[in-house]
Amino acid sequence: MHIEARLFEFIAGFFFLTALLYGVLTALFATGGEEWAGTTALALTGGLALIVATFFRFVARRIDTRPEDYEGAEISDGAGELGFFSPHSWWPILIALSGSVAAVGIALWLPWLIVAGVMFILSSVAGLVFEYYLGPEKH
């Protein structure tokens, strides 16, 4: 996880530097003054990358060194169970559709569609979380 953390720290630094340069250059050369939307978007993108980098740093401290993190690793060092994955689940598709409904409601500013989208999102996430606790797949 150290490599991933370094990668996202580099990305965060790049976006912060780009936001600073963009803000200064638009303030100096743009006819309407500084363009705040782009500066804010670049700064927030850097902030999101920094959040991911910080998460990877915390995870790297908690777990043992992975085969990906040292040079002398063999392919067989990474063998083993990776976790449980649900290959037949339809819930992620429903979550995406629900998010689309909410996004269209926000874009068109239709409060009833926003509420419907949020309700669909909550019910879809509940379905995903409880997928293996209800119904025929119950373990």
Swiss-Prot record:
Its EC number is 7.1.1.9. One of its GO terms (cellular component) is plasma membrane. It comes from the Bacteria. InterPro entries: Cyt_c_oxidase_su4_actinobac (IPR021050). Its main location: membrane. One of its GO terms (molecular function) is cytochrome-c oxidase activity. One of its GO terms (biological process) is electron transport chain. It is an enzyme of class 7 (translocase). It is found in: Cell membrane. The chain crosses the membrane at residues 10-30, 36-56, 78-98, 101-121. It is a multi-pass membrane protein. Keywords: Cell membrane, Membrane, Translocase, Transmembrane, Transmembrane helix. The keyword Transmembrane helix applies. Associates with subunits I, II and III to form cytochrome c oxidase. Part of cytochrome c oxidase, its function is unknown. This is Probable cytochrome c oxidase polypeptide 4. It comes from Mycolicibacterium paratuberculosis (strain ATCC BAA-968 / K-10) (Mycobacterium paratuberculosis).
